[in-house]
Amino acid sequence: MASSSLPNLVPLGPESLRPFTRASLAAIERRALEEEARLQRNKQMEIQETERNARSDLEAGKNLPLIYGDPPPEVIGIPLEDLDPYYSNKKTFIVLNKGKAIFRFSATPALYMLSPFSIIRRSAIKVLIHSLFSMFIMITILPNCVVMTMSDPPPWPIHVENTFTGINTFESLIKMLARGFCIDDFTFLRDPWNWLDFSVIMMAYLTEFVDLGNISALRTFRVLRALKTITVIPGLKTIVGALIQSVKKLSDVMILTVFCLSVFALVGLQLFMGNLRQKCVRWPQPFNDTNTTWYGNDTWYSNDTWNSNDTWSSNDMWNSHESMASNYTFDWDAYINDEGNFYFLEGAKDALLCGNSSDAGHCPEGYKCIKTGRNPNYGYTSHDTFSWAFLALFRLMIQDYWENLFQLTLRAAGKTYMIFFVVIIFLGSFYLINLILAVVTMAYAEQNEATLAEDQEKEEEFQQMMEKFQKQQEELEKAKADQALEGGEAGGDPAHSKDCNGSLDTSPGEKGPPRQSCSADSGVSDAMEELEEAHQKCPPWWYKCAHKVLIWNCCTPWVKFKNIIHLIVMDPFVDLGITICIVLNTLFMAMEHYPMTEHFDKVLTVGNLVFTGIFTAEMVLKLIALDPYEYFQQGWNVFDSIIVTLSWVELGLVNVKGLSVLRSFRLVRSLKLAKSWPTLNMFIRIIGNSGGGLGNLTLVLAIIVVNFSVVGMQLFGKNYKECVCKNASDCALPRWKMCDFFHSFLIVLRILCGEWIEPMWGFMEVAGQAMFLTVLLMVMVNGNLVDLDLFLALLLNPLNSDNLSASDEDGEMNNLQISSWPIKLGICFANAFLLGLLHGKILSPKDIMLSLGDPGEAGEAGEAEESAPEDEKKEPPPEDDDKDLKKDNHILNHMGLVDGTPTSIELDHLNFINNPYLTIHVPIASEESDLEMPTEEETDTFSEPEDGKKPLQPLDGNSSVCSTADYKPPEEDPEEQAEENPEGEQPEECFTEACVQRFPCLSVDISQGRGKMWWTLRRACFKIVEHHWFKTFNSSLILLNSGTLAFEDIYIEQRRVIRTILEYADKVFTYIFIMEMLLKWVAYGFKVYFTNAWCWLDFLIVDVSIISLVANWLGYSELGPIKSLRTLRALRPLRALSRFEGMRVVVNALLGAIPSIMNVLLVCLIFWVIFSIMGVNLFAAKIYYFINTTTSERFDISGVNNKSECESLIHTGQVRWLNVKVNYDNVGLGYLSLLQVATFKGWMDIMYSAVDSREQEEQPQYEVNIYMYLYFVIFIIFGSFFTINSLIRLIIVNFNQQKKKLGGKDIFMTEEQKKYYNAMKKLGSKKPQKPIPRPQNKIQGMVYDFVTKQVFDITIMILICLNMVTMMVETDDQSQLKVDILYNINMVFIIVFTGECVLKMFALRQNYFTVGWNIFDFVVVILSIVGLALSDLIQKYFVSPTLFRVIRLARIGRVLRLIRGAKGIRTLLFALMMSLPALFNIGLLLILVMFIYSIFGMSNFAYVKKESGIDDMFNFETFGNSIICLFEITTSAGWDGLLNPILNSGPPDCDPTLENPGTSVRGDCGNPSIGICFFCSYIIISFLIVVNMYIAIILENFNVATEESSDPLGEDDFEIFFEKWEKFGPDATQFIDYSRLSDFVDTLQEPLRIAKPNKIKLITLDLPMVPGDKIHCLDILFALTKEVLGDSGEMDALKETMEEKFMAANPSKVSYEPITTTLKRKQEEVCAIKIQRAYRRHLLQRSVKQASYMYRHSQDGSGDGAPEKEGLIANTMSKMYGRENGNSGVQNKGEERGSTGDAGPTMGLTPINPSDSALPPSPPPGLPLHPGVKESLV
């Protein structure tokens, strides 16, 4: 019965769970034999069948699906037959535990002894599957982990360790007994997770019983036990499996990344080898002998004549002067290696670097730049060998503390080499790192889709089962009713009408099995109940109890009182009031600062008490109104109650020390704003989701962090204590160490945050390089991969992924929106009234209501006003009005902006007043709608206005009228605008209609008189401003004008001529731009000009120039306001935005995203305010310290404990009570601190101060408050990780939304059409090339054959790689012997490559230069020879010869020719090529932003004090230096160091009266407020917006590139086709002989190849043939393409398109008319053969008749009745067998001969086999006959 209705489903319930018996095993063996026989039979018959896969829902570890019902107790824990059909012929069985989890085992004997029926094995299985067993193992793992985290364990943990080892051994033994060891499937070692157990146990016994010397490393393996949590906790294995899959996908990116890094490292090695050892060394003091003074007079020393191109690196100079100081010995090497002679900056660990080029760093007076000592950072930062260069480049690509490497390199090598870093950052860091992101994204997306598909399948199955249950229940009820009816009619005993004891009754006339009545009824009911209960959160008794206790309806007065309270509390205005209170409460808490007056402190305390009272009252009233049962059903109410309770607890414990942190819980209340703020709501849901749905991934990350923390502590803890003096002169342990678990945990977290290079230097000093690098790499790869996956899971989570500002799911307005509606109405009313006054009309309230339209639109739709069109305004019947109202609201609430076009429809509100049933539609902006976009029909229905009511469209803010690049009249459609020619347009009206109505004199008649002259003038001006010459001239002037700003640096006062030129140029530019503005006013009119954003920008910038000009004339140029106004000149380059298409596109995209970006930024600010206020509570006034101003040393806490003790010493003048510059004394500075922590720049100082803090106004103490590290850890996770990644998510989603709105034509194509279209698009641009002809000369021909062989190319590639290897082995301090050897090897390579070049030129002659790669090789060879031959000359007079060595590296580019075979890498490079145009546009915008900010920086921060990050090279003094600084900050690197000096606002930090030589500007103080705004805005614009647009574009293009590469046919397939074609068609005629077609298609590569034998296949392709039996390449390619992609209806259209493209690409193609096709040709041949055969048969029959007649005639002599009296046969037969031949024997022979067909040749016919008379010839053996062909041939 169960399976009859749904035969495709497995039998229901417990009946499908059958015990596994010996009979079951025998049945499996029988099925296995049958399957083997069947497969053998299929193999012989060449029948292919699809592979069956195991069912995913019946995998081991998953729960038994619901369709099997609740398994009875007797089948729990015993072997059962496998439910999965896949295993029906495999020796497996399953066991279920009480939790219905499936365990699968092998049915073969375990350990060769224990069969599935053995008592020992069954017992082991019962233990293994028991939930308590896994619980016990989990409980043992946790204490084991705790013991391992002890840094100095007592002796007793050794016994604990042995206990854990014993438990693990017992677990493994149980598994082996239950499963078997390793031979079959599902045995112990077949599970990779068990390898972990096995290795841990083996290591434990090894260390216990075998003496292995230093076993600390082996003991570290014990930490792997913690990974067992992954095997025990359900779901974690799946997550780890998915992670491993994503690693597999990364192989191609990793190869490309390593290749690029190697090339960049080689470039770095050649450019900067040894540079970072150049230091400033004090020049030796003068010394005399008795006769000679040899210091001061010698020109080689004088500072004036010091040759800056020489580095002092030897003692040759001293030797040359030995005779002058014969009595004095001087050890030069010892002197220059003595660190005491190096120049150190204050507080620096390494000596100051310097360089010998003009733009490198220079030494102070008395010091010289000499190459000596070790490299910076313990000697680990250098380019001296390939390995260190590779590490440096890896660090640069990861962007970890790269500003340090950047500054060191530029100081040593020169600022010109900034170009090197720009290339690495943009190509390596932004592109390759984001490619890794893109690949993992795809892997995650695929995995997500698979999971969703599986869930969908389960859901469908569940629905199917529910339907089946319901159907069965209905049938049973019907049957019972029928039975009852029959029983009643028969008057029978009702007790006998049904049997409740499970007996079966069969309906009369029904065949088949008897039907179960009562037991089936109860079974179905139980199943239904079980399915329903599965969806309930709590057990049923809980609901009964809750209804009694938690619902308060005791008496009628109480219920009435409750209803009144409900009415008040649930009012939207109360909600609004509470929201305002939350905002005010947050503001009150944010007003705390230091120092704060006592009165202000009291005000804040009272305010907080009031707010606590308000929120308590709200909670109590809601409890009364809703009852606790309803109240606690809502998450927000639970949240409220927790916060209120904690507030009261905090008030009670206010004086308890250390519990002030409880105040922080009140801050969380501001998150309640999420209730009415969708973006904040989404943000909180994302975070909640990471703890819920993504909890497993978070747990895996936590396990990895804990594991590596313990590993680090075990491996390196002892080293730190023993080798601490290597790192610190005072032998004190550093802050970052692995001596205990907490510090080790912090270091692992720091590495995961991307800060690994600084800890690495210290660790390599104490722990050795190899060991730490291994651990570090493992932490980075494992941790960052999980981290990245977690990030992507958040980023790509389906939760609101397409809808960032979605409101509640039901689409209804929330209480805040409802309550704010009247307020918005009031504001609109006031606006309309004021506008009426301006227009000279006093409007009545009714008129204002009419003019307003729908007030909801102002609040909800923003830019677009939408309401119901006239044709919808029909009066619905009263009884349906509520339903219609709901329906209409539901549809129109979700209309939004359709296709990005704002619709505007006027609503006649009089109709609404007269018709109360008319629906008011409150639209919601598109980004707030939860529904999909309406279809075209819906759009037409709801948003198409009547013709007469279409309003005048305002000018699109994205178009640039002012730029004159894309000016169109405003009322036209965008499509029409794009198509029309702007030259033929007419100017618009000058003024708006309102202005003309107000001032009638503005209306001019343009048909006559002055009006006509005015119109003519306007048209002339219009033509001028629209002319492309005017635009070009204008753009050039803007660029020149912007360029002049770059010269206004600190040296402008000294360059009088340049200054004068700039002043005159500024005036000229101002006049020209005023003229341009006036021209545009006349041409466009005020209406158009002032309704365009770009024109407003122009207008404001020109205004600033005019004001500056007037102020100069009047002599007020030195006034403060005028000076600050001049700063705004930095905005001039913004005018270039509207002139350059590429930048404008990017800006338009950004402008479209700005509302959403601002929304999320605001959310981030709300989220950060919690941490900022918390920081103020925790650290305000606690991070001051006492310092000695002369030595900059801090006083110890034992000497000076607090501020009062400090103040008693301040009178000495050499000490100071100092605060950290970036601190938590108020919320604003707290925000700045958090920004530094979030960007990981400057955060160490903030964190150290916080951790050392004690109480207010007390001296800090080293790590006294160590757990304050957790504040920063929590902020980094929630404040930095989530907020910044949400912003990235927003930008990517917004980018995709805009792309959808402005989507291309692809949207209207099917997937199949896209494939065809892409294949044709690639194919169309190709054409067969004429190959280079082989020379006639014999020797040249031989060389030609040699150089065109593939082996020759591969050999050259190998030599190129070997050449790279020889360059890699170069080091800085290599011996002379090594130098000579490498020189000779390089010489050999140059000879080889020159030889290759010469040979190719000899063989290919002038054709050599027709190939791009050959020209590339030629240039490299020439430069290599020039560099070798003229190195001395070049070094002396021109550039460094290292540049020529770098040019040799260009040869490695040839290796890229080999990547045709590497499809994955080709896809990545293809994605880069596709991204380049968009990335170029973003790069332009970034350059513009950098330019503006560098000008602004020069004008504001040029003279700040040189300290921290600002020094003699990195500053804002010149334009070049500013650009270098801003490039650094683009990745948020080093901005804290640049900001610190700008925060100096007065003495003693800086001197406001300091004179700056060469200028009139005084002082070296900064402006903190301007500095903070400058850096924060730049970081947000560049780092968060522009850089993340890079990510969006790369993700998008990588997806496109992957789609392209996954197409069956790619560009390379077509390239290979034409390459092969060149060999078969050497004359490039585009035709091939039909006879050569078979060979040609056989030489192609898959998928286009048709392997031999292919004759019949080619015939079926039906290829057109032209005279001469030739076939065109296009026809062949098209046929092969169709063969690969399959046939479809669009093929003909696509073929035409392809031919058009090919004709365009191949103008030489001769038009041809095919005369036949290959199929027709074959059919013609077959027909000819058939006709021949038929005719032969006919002749044969006649010949036989004639022969018979002749035989008879020879016997009886009768001559009558001859069949052939005359003709060919008669004559021939007569000649051969006539009477003249004599006797009959001859005739007999003739008959025999004739009968066998030998007469044929004599009659001029081909001999034929009689068997051929019926059928055409068979194909050769081995060639299958194509069925279609066979039919046509026969």
Swiss-Prot record:
For the keyword Magnesium, the answer is no
Source taxon at top rank: Eukaryota
A biological-process GO annotation: regulation of skeletal muscle contraction by action potential
The record's subcellular location field reads: Cell membrane
- InterPro entries listed in its UniProt record: Ion_trans_dom, Na_channel_a4su_mammal, Na_channel_asu, Na_chnl_inactivation_gate, Na_trans_assoc_dom, VGCC_Ca_Na, Volt_channel_dom_sf
Cytoplasmic compartment segments:
1-131, 179-192, 234-252, 439-572, 623-636, 677-692, 792-1029, 1080-1093, 1140-1156, 1289-1351, 1400-1411, 1460-1478, 1595-1834
The segments carrying the III repeats are 1010-1323
Q: Mind telling me which GO cellular component terms the entry cites?
A: plasma membrane; voltage-gated sodium channel complex
Question: What is catalysed by this protein?
Answer: Na(+)(in) = Na(+)(out)
Q: Where is this site: Important for inhibition by tetrodotoxin?
A: 401
The II repeats extend over 554-826
The disulfide bonds in this chain are 280-354, 363-369, 725-731, 1550-1565
Keyword field contains Glycoprotein: yes
The residues exposed to the Extracellular compartment are 151-157, 211-216, 273-385, 411-417, 592-602, 657-658, 712-740, 762-772, 1048-1060, 1113-1120, 1177-1227, 1250-1266, 1370-1380, 1430-1442, 1497-1518, 1542-1571
Intramembrane annotation, residue ranges: 386-410, 741-761, 1228-1249, 1519-1541
- Please note every region of biased composition (Basic and acidic residues): 870-886
Q: Read off the domain note.
A: The sequence contains 4 internal repeats, each with 5 hydrophobic segments (S1, S2, S3, S5, S6) and one positively charged segment (S4). Segments S4 are probably the voltage-sensors and are characterized by a series of positively charged amino acids at every third position.
- What does the record give as the function of this protein? Pore-forming subunit of Nav1.4, a voltage-gated sodium (Nav) channel that directly mediates the depolarizing phase of action potentials in excitable membranes. Navs, also called VGSCs (voltage-gated sodium channels) or VDSCs (voltage-dependent sodium channels), operate by switching between closed and open conformations depending on the voltage difference across the membrane. In the open conformation they allow Na(+) ions to selectively pass through the pore, along their electrochemical gradient.
Question: Associated disorder, per UniProt?
Answer: Defects in SCN4A are the cause of periodic paralysis hyperkalemic (HYPP). HYPP is an autosomal dominant channelopathy characterized by episodic flaccid generalized muscle weakness associated with high levels of serum potassium. HYPP is frequently found in Quarter Horses, the most popular equine breed in the United States.
Subunit architecture:
The Nav1.4 voltage-gated sodium channel consists of an ion-conducting alpha subunit SCN4A which is functional on its own and a regulatory beta subunit SCN1B. SCN1B strongly enhances the presence of SCN4A at the cell surface. SCN1B is also required for rapid channel inactivation and recovery after inactivation. It prevents the decrease of channel activity in response to repetitive, high-frequency depolarizations.
Spell out the protein name for this chain. Sodium channel protein type 4 subunit alpha
Q: What is the lineage of its organism?
A: Eukaryota, Metazoa, Chordata, Craniata, Vertebrata
Q: Which gene encodes it?
A: SCN4A
